[in-house]
């Protein structure tokens, strides 16, 4: 992903728009397939920035800046803004908006897909998130080597409620458990369809994600790997998730790798697959968690499982 120099967006790039419309209208056709719904309500935009607790020394990552309605407000508070945008037309609009102003020196525009790009360090993330990257963005932010202190993100309302869901809630899922392990999540505001241009088909909500410090002393991928198994059928017993051939094959392979690192071998006459199955069944039975349903299990119960599996040499990533 390359930095977008200002000169790239001068001249013809600023005059032309999708569908042959002229730049003088300051309007081009939004690509809703990319989740382009511009936040037009200045009060909502200011509320998002205010909730981000930006310090004068902060570098802020903005995902999907669009035409810059949030960006210009972030620039007033932050030391630097890195805006990641896939659409060159949007990048052109944003560049033009700050051109010749003091804020121009504080803004770096990166063209490309935020999910596929290695990101530089940043303190805060703000995003009017394209809905199709909601889950990948959350996981990418939490799995950064140095996760942002605060993320204030706009999502489809139902997705936002999944982040906040508790055991027993209908929306409680792997995402809920995962995010709440690494961060405190709070609801900032609900945002109606009429606050966007063009209006999306659903209501939106803004959430604030504040990472835990210190970070929980578990491996991100191990935790996520366990939850993937447990939530394959969240309303079935956890036992059921560990009986699929695909899951057993992965755990058997990982167990074999663990044995090699420990300098151990399977006793002659033993079947590795049977050994792994026996270990899994013993853990699920001894903890009493095997007969529980993931939809009703809390963080403590999943942590108990992960610790017991690791003691037995069974890993998930």
Swiss-Prot record:
InterPro entries registered for this protein in UniProt: KsgA/Erm, rRNA_Ade_Mease_Trfase_CS, rRNA_Ade_methylase_Trfase_N, rRNA_adenine_dimethylase, SAM-dependent_MTases_sf
Stretches the record annotates as Disordered: 1-22
Annotated catalysed reactions: adenosine(1779)/adenosine(1780) in 18S rRNA + 4 S-adenosyl-L-methionine = N(6)-dimethyladenosine(1779)/N(6)-dimethyladenosine(1780) in 18S rRNA + 4 S-adenosyl-L-homocysteine + 4 H(+)
Pfam families (UniProt xref): RrnaAD
Signal peptide: none
Residues holding S-adenosyl-L-methionine: 37, 39, 64, 85, 113, 128
Alphabetical keyword list: Methyltransferase, RNA-binding, rRNA processing, S-adenosyl-L-methionine, Transferase
Keyword rRNA processing assigned: yes
EC number, UniProt record: 2.1.1.183
GO BP, one annotated term: rRNA methylation
GO molecular function: 18S rRNA (adenine(1779)-N(6)/adenine(1780)-N(6))-dimethyltransferase activity; RNA binding; rRNA (adenine-N6,N6-)-dimethyltransferase activity
Function: Specifically dimethylates two adjacent adenosines in the loop of a conserved hairpin near the 3'-end of 18S rRNA in the 40S particle.
Membership in a protein family: Belongs to the class I-like SAM-binding methyltransferase superfamily. rRNA adenine N(6)-methyltransferase family.
Protein name (Swiss-Prot/TrEMBL): Dimethyladenosine transferase
Source species of the chain: Yarrowia lipolytica (strain CLIB 122 / E 150)
Phylogenetic classification of the source organism: Eukaryota, Fungi, Dikarya, Ascomycota, Saccharomycotina
């Amino acid at each position: 992903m390359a930095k977008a120099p200002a000169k790239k967006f001068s001249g013809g790039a600023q005059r032309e728009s999708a569908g042959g419309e002229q730049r003088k209208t300051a309007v081009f056709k939004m690509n809703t397939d990319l989740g382009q719904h511009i936040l037009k309500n200045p009060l909502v935009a200011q509320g998002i920035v205010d909730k981000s607790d930006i310090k004068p020394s902060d570098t802020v990552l903005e995902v999907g800046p669009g035409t810059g309605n949030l960006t210009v407000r972030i620039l007033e508070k932050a030391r630097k803004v890195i805006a990641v945008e896939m659409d060159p037309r949007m990048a052109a609009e944003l560049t033009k908006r700050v051109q010749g102003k003091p804020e121009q020196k504080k803004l770096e525009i990166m063209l490309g897909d935020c999910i596929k790009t290695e990101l530089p360090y940043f303190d805060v993330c703000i995003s009017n998130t394209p809905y199709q990257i909601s889950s990948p963005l959350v996981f990418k932010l939490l799995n950064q080597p140095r996760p942002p202190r605060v993320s204030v993100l706009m999502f489809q309302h139902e997705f936002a409620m999944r982040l906040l869901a508790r055991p027993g809630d209908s929306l409680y899922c792997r995402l809920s458990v995962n995010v709440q392990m690494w961060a405190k999540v709070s609801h900032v505001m609900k945002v109606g369809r009429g606050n966007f241009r063009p209006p999306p088909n659903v209501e939106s909500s803004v959430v604030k994600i504040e990472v835990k410090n210190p970070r929980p002393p578990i491996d991100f991928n191990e935790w996520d790997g366990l939850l993937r198994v447990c939530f394959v059928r969240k309303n079935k017993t956890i036992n059921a998730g560990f009986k699929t051939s695909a899951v057993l094959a992965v755990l058997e392979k990982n167990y074999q790798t663990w044995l090699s690192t420990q300098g151990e071998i399977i006793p002659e006459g033993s079947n590795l697959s049977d050994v792994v199955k026996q270990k899994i069944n013993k853990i699920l039975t001894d903890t009493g968690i095997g007969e529980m349903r993931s939809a009703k299990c809390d963080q403590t119960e999943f942590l108990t499982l992960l610790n017991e599996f690791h003691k037995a040499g069974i890993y998930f990533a």
